Amino acid sequence: MSKNRAASIRARLKNRSDAAKQDFNLTLTHYGLERLLYRLSTSKHAPNFLLKGALLFKLWYVVPQRPTRDADLLGLGPDDIDSVAAVFRDLCVIEVDDGIAFEAGSVKTKTAEIRKEAGYGGGGACRTARDAGRCAALAADRHRFW
């Protein structure tokens, strides 16, 4: 990824954010999440995940929904923290010329008892993304489905 490409993408995102009167940090976060999801879609892990939550609604509806700063994923397969971390580290090393570099070493995971009464848990992963002059943490939650 060239610095000029990253700077160009950042400038276009700034213009889009200004035109929509949207918080620029939210625009950058959404772009980062979308690029993370792109990497997931091109990876060997793609068949094991489904997008859900507010980010999905953003794709379906023209009417703005509540702002979200993470991606909610329904995951199939192992849900132990080490497996979740390995998936996100794999995604971080996929190179795409989109102005973002994800840092595999920055992946941090957490366990969560999500809907414990329903019999499934989950976990989350957070990683650092860098673009032209900006570093941000992006989060994704993975929920287990049986």
Residue ranges of each PLM-predicted region?
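Compositionally biased terminal segments of proteins
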Residues: 1-146
